[in-house]
Amino acid sequence: GMDGRGDAPELNSRMLTRRALLVPQHGELSSEPFPVSLYRYRQTAMATGWEITLPGLAAMQMDLVDEAFSRLHDIESRLTVYRDESEVSSLNRLQSGVRVPITPDLVEVLGRCLNWWEMTGGAFDVACGRMIKEWGFFKGPASVPRPEAPGIQPEANGMDKVDLDLAERTFRWKAQGVELNFGCVGKGFAVDAMAGILTIPRVL
């Protein structure tokens, strides 16, 4: 998941500048009779190393590489629970019954998560932030919670407490004290978004 290490200054700082580090390498493509140059662009986000590898002239399109990494950091800033100023953190502080507008990213992620929650009969659930904290998976240490621990009770968790208006792009909590955690979907959502920027006919 998107653990707190991703926001530590020594881990989350971008390499050198906002422009990704260029690392030339050489490889062999089976369809080519000669070696081709591969270029790797690396940055860190969500406590993970991210890399874009492009061949030949495609690797020279630095504006699109920068755009892809900028999109990654933008998504992290919205979905991480390890920054008080993130969008999801603001939703987790929201009083129940108060409806607020949310960004297109949150609409899309929450819409997908609601569908998966319904498809799995509630087994897939991102409204389990309280439970994650009770188990010590937020900032540690990990430990089995007491059966009576407030954060593991049904009333403290569950997408059934989420009211998402897709048409109006708004959100409200139906119950107080429930929290979102996108640790299970954040990286995949970011990969899809970055691939959309780099896909044919633009680069790949």
Q: Can you name each region flagged by the protein language model?
A:
Residues 3-183, 193-203:
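A contiguous, well-ordered beta/alpha segment that forms the leading edge of an enzyme domain
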